[in-house]
Amino acid sequence: MAVNLAYGPYGSGHDHPDRLTITVHALGQVICPDAGSWGYENPMHLTWANQTVAHNTVSIDGLSQEPQGRSRSIWAGERGEQRVFGVLRLFHAGDHLKAARATCDTAYEGGRLDRTVCL
């Protein structure tokens, strides 16, 4: 079993507003996939994939994380808005327990995301 906790910086317009999203893999399968991965030619890319709700993370008040926020533009991050990034607070790879914790206080003005995953 493996869990990916994505906390890194927002990577411009090709990235999605999904800090602290997780994907879970087990027995050679993705059992908790990122539902926000569609090709640019697919109409779901603009209406679904580019919104925080399409990912396995948290949204506040139904809004997407910055820099998307209230914007419907797929290039919201290209306008030089607030940099969004998470910080790895804990990483432990012990024999019996593996754990990671990350926080992000730049995805929402006045909000803080905090996520811990353990195996």
Model-inferred region functions:
Residues 1-119:
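Catalytic and substrate-binding regions of extracellular carbohydrate-active enzymes
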